[in-house]
């Protein structure tokens, strides 16, 4: 089993040995065993609190292999609002519930949840379920180990 111990900045030109598709929740696991899509077992042994992002590169402990992290598509709810204020209100209510949210100027996205979906519909947002890569905000106290 290969053990990956170092985080490198995203580099589209890097020659990687493997890719590892992980959900948003899996990208928060800094010490965990995973299996690549082609069945290779890898172990991440990164500093505690490391959160991985789409495109990150990890270096194996013997410096012989690189692996690229890919944001794995997962079931999410995407919410759109007619006005910026309505989108802001929705973000407030989701934040009040400590829900991991991907925030953009035009939509909010979170892991599929029927109760939260109904709440946003009651507020007047248009919501739809999709299978897409999910990249939530880390929060005010989230650790960020390198620039993107």
Curated annotation (Swiss-Prot):
Superkingdom, natural source: Bacteria
SUPFAM superfamilies assigned to the protein according to its UniProt record, in alphabetical order: Urease metallochaperone UreE, C-terminal domain, Urease metallochaperone UreE, N-terminal domain
CDD domains: UreE (cd00571)
Compartment list: Cytoplasm
One GO-annotated biological process of the protein: urea metabolic process
Keywords, in A-Z order: Chaperone, Cytoplasm, Nickel
Record's keyword annotation contains Cytoplasm: yes
Keyword Cell cycle in annotation: no
GO CC terms, sorted: cytoplasm
Annotated Pfam families: UreE_C, UreE_N
Family annotation (InterPro entries): UreE, UreE_C_dom, UreE_N, UreE_N_sf
GO molecular function: nickel cation binding; unfolded protein binding
Chief localisation class: cytoplasm
Primary role: Involved in urease metallocenter assembly. Binds nickel. Probably functions as a nickel donor during metallocenter assembly.
Family classification: Belongs to the UreE family.
Protein name: Urease accessory protein UreE
Originating organism: Nostoc punctiforme (strain ATCC 29133 / PCC 73102)
Lineage: Bacteria, Bacillati, Cyanobacteriota, Cyanophyceae, Nostocales
Encoding gene per record: ureE
């Amino acid at each position: 089993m290969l053990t990956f111990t170092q985080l490198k900045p995203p580099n589209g030109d890097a020659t990687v040995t493997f890719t590892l598709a992980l959900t948003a929740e899996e990208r928060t696991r800094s010490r965990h065993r995973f299996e690549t899509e082609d069945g290779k077992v890898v172990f991440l042994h990164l500093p505690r609190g490391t959160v991985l992002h789409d495109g990150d590169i990890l270096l194996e402990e013997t410096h012989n292999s690189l692996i690229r992290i890919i944001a794995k598509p997962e079931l999410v709810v995407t919410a759109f609002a007619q006005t910026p204020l309505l989108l802001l209100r929705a973000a407030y209510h989701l934040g009040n519930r400590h829900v991991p949210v991907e925030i953009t100027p035009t939509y909010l996205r979170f892991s599929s949840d029927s109760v939260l979906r109904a709440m946003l519909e009651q507020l007047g947002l248009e919501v739809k379920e999709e299978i897409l890569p999910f990249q939530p905000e880390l929060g005010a106290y989230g650790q960020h180990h390198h620039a993107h």
